[in-house]
Each structure stands twice: as C-alpha cells, then as structure tokens.
C-alpha cells in the first residue's frame, strides 16, 4: 500500500515538474502570454497616469484662469488708465504646450528660449601689424646706442660685448622670418 502511494506521488511530482504543453500551447507560449500581460498592465498604468496628469493640468488651468481674471477685474476697477508697476513680470503663461518638458521647474516661462551661438569655423589666425617686431628691435637698438653715447663707460661692460648681443638678436630675428 505504501509502495503504491509513493509511486503515485512520484508520478504526480514528475508530471507537475515536467513542462507539458497545455491546450496545444507550449510552455514558452504561456510565458510570452504572461509577458504580454505585464506589458499590457504597464501600458494601462501609463495611460492612467497620463489621464491623471491631463486632469491635473485642466484643473490648474481653470484655477489660474480664475485667479488671472480676478486680478484683471481688481486692477481695472481701481484705475483704468494706470500703468502697471515696473517690478511686475508679465510673462505669458502657457499650458498644454508641446515644449513643456524643455524647461526646469525653477525657470520662468519666457517667450524666447535660449539660442545657442553658432560655432566659429576654424580659419587663419590674425597676424599682428607687419613689421611690429622690427620696430621693437629698432627701439631697443636706439636705447642701447643712446645708453652708450650718454657716457656710461666704465661700468664694466665693453662696447664690443653690447654690439655682439645686438648682432645675435638681429641674427635671431632673421632666422625667425
């Protein structure tokens, strides 16, 4: 008796653990159907969320429209020809527009959006005024010659040494060009 009971249990466990197609469908087909059901649930959830968001927008739009018209009525009753104070902002409020996701919550609703500056095309760099370096070298030579002519001899520097440095600077200048 116990042997027969163990045998029946083992067959039952085997049948339950073995993947058997049910109703002509494979087990993989069943899992696909379950996945489809999950995606359907996600779709319904997203749809419900969007409907709730739309209702919230309509409610806020209606609420702000009442506030906006109440503000206009109050100001028009006070004085019809008065100018608005300069510190008030008159930014247009837009609802339900397609560009709603572009703005952060702390940004104001300005009409103009930020426009990126066009990138500069790489081109030739501007060169300085031609001959500027030569003019600087001439100035240096003039100051040296004025210094030598002023009578600062005996300072330990010889005239030949100074003329050598001016020659080397001229040589360097000619090498650069």
Curated annotation (Swiss-Prot):
Extent of Basic and acidic residues compositional bias: 109-118
UniProt-listed SMART domains: PTH
Subcellular location: Secreted; Cytoplasm; Nucleus
Record-level GO cellular component terms: cytoplasm; cytosol; extracellular region; extracellular space; Golgi apparatus; nucleoplasm
Region (Important for receptor binding): 57-68
Function: Neuroendocrine peptide which is a critical regulator of cellular and organ growth, development, migration, differentiation and survival and of epithelial calcium ion transport. Acts by binding to its receptor, PTH1R, activating G protein-coupled receptor signaling. Regulates endochondral bone development and epithelial-mesenchymal interactions during the formation of the mammary glands and teeth. Required for skeletal homeostasis. Promotes mammary mesenchyme differentiation and bud outgrowth by modulating mesenchymal cell responsiveness to BMPs.
Cited InterPro entries: PTH-rel (IPR003626), PTH/PTH-rel (IPR001415)
Name of encoding gene: PTHLH
MF term (GO), any: peptide hormone receptor binding
Official protein name in the record: Parathyroid hormone-related protein
Organism field: Homo sapiens
